[in-house]
């Protein structure tokens, strides 16, 4: 499938998963971003749970998010230094606190505002209802 995208002119892949650092298959330590990079040789953006302990599905179930860049930065640094991805995207953490990157850069993680389901507004209620129906 990656080959078809490459043939169509894709020059960057965005590998979005619940948790960027989780291996995609049990036989390998590579996450989805790592596999995309390995198979295509193209630059890859990884995303999924950066600085968070709870994934989006758990958030919709009412589980509180503990936010800190220290939570999974060792895994992020390890995978980045292993050239599994070229860029990292920040989703929920940046929705909750638009200054997240600056606070991490400046060594002020204690000032990061944690993501709450209410940060998504009306979308949160619709997703919560859909999640309840699916259960």
Can you describe what each PLM-predicted range is?
Residues 1-135:
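Flavin-dependent oxidoreductase catalytic cores
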